[in-house]
């Protein structure tokens, strides 16, 4: 009986030991699970805080952009462009025309995009001619010579307006014209469009060109006949160096123009006698 009693006690003791061991392991496992849960929760919280911080930063940035003045925006875009290492000529667009601020701001993310295939119907028109801008993001980032259309492409942009207006072919975009001019050596080492492009170059699209002396009565007659005029401009109201613009209509001494670099200029009516002294060369076009 004693032996049996000892064996029974030993068995109970052994069972108690195993139970204690199981409880200890269970407790340890529970602590590990709790620790893991806490770690996950902390990680989720940290991640949530990081996301919130980024969102807050973005919201702050968006709010800043919404509340900044035009001058403040230009200053911000200029600083961002300098920091990002944008080409100097691109940054200089801000000094020449504040209207280009969106183009400059988007340069980094859009400079390698493919140009638009057509001039769309929603583009504004001056009579029969679309008012196309060389710094339009649809083609302004495209190359011209060793530059880009936004910086140096006033010539190709003027020709694009002529071709679309006179022929109705909306696939002749500034980038198409710039490619043709570059490939056929109508752009010089300074990325300026040669005058030869305004005469022989436009024949590629079936246009007829003749030079004019710029006499006001002659200009009035040609414009009234529906013949647009391209002018090469000296420094003055339109440029500091050189520029091309289109005259589209004449009325009582005033002309309407398409300036490929300035929306503001294109919206004005200009007294021909005021700008005639700034004209270097004149070409008249027809289909």
Walk through the language-model features, giving the residues of each.
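Active-site-adjacent structural segments surrounding the nucleophilic cysteine of cysteine proteases
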Residues: 4-186
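Conserved active-site-adjacent core of cysteine acyl-enzyme catalytic domains
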Residues: 12-14, 75, 164, 168-287
